[in-house]
Amino acid sequence: MGLLFNVEDFNKVVKEYKLTSLYNKSDRLCGDADIDNYVVVNDVNCAWEYWFAALLAQHRMNRKTASSRDGAVAAEIINAITVVKDPTRMIVKSEARKMPMRYAVGELLWYLSGSNKLKDIGLFSSAWERMSDDGETVNSCYGHKIQHFYGFDQWQDVIDRLKADPNSRQAVIQIKNPRPMSEPTKDTPCTLSLQFLLRNGHLNLTTTMRSNDVWTGVPYDMFSFCSMQVMMAMTLGVDVGTYTHQAGSLHIYERNLPAGEKDPEGNNETQKPKLESGVQESSVKSNK
């Protein structure tokens, strides 16, 4: 696989940013940190702290950026897989990342409403305005994609499938729809699909993403999808199983690097993101 990041740098980041969930080795059950793009953790907070530390450690090792349509990418781990053992512990509460719960809950409610209206999510963040193609609707409207976009309610379809066949491998919700390059958009959904697997009385969920920004995406995505997993388990009357989060590209943008992560030449002028960041920077997912 090759070296993703250096163990020494990883451990330094953990201490410098007080990523306390990683102090306890039982919270991170994978293997050696220098090759891992797969991690098993107890909760979402530990998941976020692990990937934040991994990306900063990789940036310290490489000191390179790559261009993208949404800005310079400071570090990237491809095919990053996270297994969360307890999805009911779904809130990022790290010292390095104060998660604005007003926005997180607002985004979840927007999904559950089935709305694709910019004005509805705009109640919680104006950042979505720059992502709308028509100034009225949003493409990354996961709730609308789940309930309305494909002509039937995918949420209810999953319920029906799992009630009819608890061992079904077809309880899948499709989020991203194909779109030709000749039809450009400002807003391409980062989430591809959600698959619910009911095994041994426990409902497991696997989310597959094409792209995920560790700063503005991961905290809110995991919060929303773990919440949906718990809701589905309650509806079916079963226990909550594990949550698996797969990202083709997991990354952090240069603009979101903490101030102390400047490159040796001093060319990196990014500022440390505000920990109490409010909603303006919160969750614009389309080009992550």
Q: What name fits each language-model region?
A:
Residues 2-288:
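Terminal, non-catalytic protein-protein interaction segments that mediate quaternary/complex assembly
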